[in-house]
Design a protein with these regions (language model features):
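C-terminal lobe and adjacent flexible extensions of AdoMet/dcAdoMet transferase-like proteins
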Residues: 209, 227-286
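Catalytic cores of RNA-modifying enzymes
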Residues: 1-228, 257, 268, 277-284
């Protein structure tokens, strides 16, 4: 059973007061104060002790201290410079902890690899909700050694990540993430598990990398372009949406016929495999 000494209101408040800190709503910080949630996150992550874990938004280190008990090393990225002294104190206590100060969307994979002593293999985080979806997709796109992610996100984001074709929350983001990974686990987290309590509900999702979704030789950025064009005008047919966003109608018609996709189809009914097939046909004319 993995717990954190900071996962309660008193310990979190005392640590913040020790360093003269108040919560920073502008950075989306709501500190996790429930050890049951910490335990479930660690269980879902299935850490065996040899992983290089990447974390974003460690805050005061509540989840970090639990992960350090389970992983070979933990590398955290924190945007708030006022939290640097707190993380420095943790680094002094744990030889397997290192951190990078900066914006997770701007820190390069090379910087992360250098800090971690190798490519990260697992991503575990209580993510800043305003950038969570973007971070998840970007990390799977740019870090090929990343096997899985276990992340806390706003419930609506979790719904988007896990959506299936035909569901109203299924969209271009879901399909693009599906080129790299799929959801394999989830549990809900109520607002009372945080300090201060957020005004939204949260969920933890596990996302595992999948192989073989698209042929290695197929440019996934082109597949993403196809997906974006298909969803650009969601209420229109896929033919009308894509023809208004960079694809010629005659080329589209030939590709639809070869793929067995009706031009009157709407993008939200197609799975990732269908977009891959469509991209394979269209890339010859790109």
């Amino acid at each position: 059973m993995t717990t954190s000494p900071l996962a309660n209101p008193t310990a979190t408040r005392e640590l913040l007061e020790e360093f003269g800190l108040a919560t920073k709503h502008r950075l989306g910080q709501n500190f996790l104060i429930d050890n049951h949630v910490i335990e479930r996150i660690c269980e879902l992550a299935e850490l065996a002790g040899d992983e290089r874990v990447l974390e974003v938004g460690p805050g005061c280190g509540t989840l970090t201290l639990a992960l350090l008990q389970e992983a070979a090393c933990v590398t955290s990225i924190e945007a708030d410079p006022e939290l640097e002294p707190v993380l420095d104190a943790h680094a002094a206590d744990y030889a397997n902890f290192r951190f990078i100060m900066g914006d997770a969307l701007k820190v390069t994979p090379e910087q992360i690899e250098q800090a971690a002593g190798g490519e990260p293999t697992v991503f575990v985080a209580n993510l800043p909700y305003n950038v969570a979806a973007t971070i998840i997709l970007q990390f799977f796109q740019t870090m090929p050694a990343l096997k899985r992610a276990v992340v806390m996100v706003q419930r609506e984001v979790a719904d988007r990540i896990a959506a299936t074709p035909g569901n109203k929350t299924y969209g271009g983001y879901t399909a693009k993430l599906g080129l790299y990974a799929q959801v394999t686990g989830r549990f809900e987290v109520p607002p009372r598990c945080f300090m201060p309590a957020p005004h939204v509900d949260s969920a933890v999702v596990r996302i595992d990398r999948v192989e073989g979704v698209a042929p290695e030789e197929l440019d996934r950025e082109f597949v993403a372009r196809v997906i974006d064009a298909a969803f650009a005008q969601r209420r229109k047919t896929i033919r009308n949406s894509m023809s208004a966003n960079g694809f010629a109608k005659d080329v589209l018609d030939a590709a639809f016929e070869d793929c067995g996709i009706a031009p009157t189809t709407r993008a939200e009914t197609l799975d990732v495999a269908a977009f891959v097939r469509l991209a394979q046909e269209l890339i010859h004319d790109a």
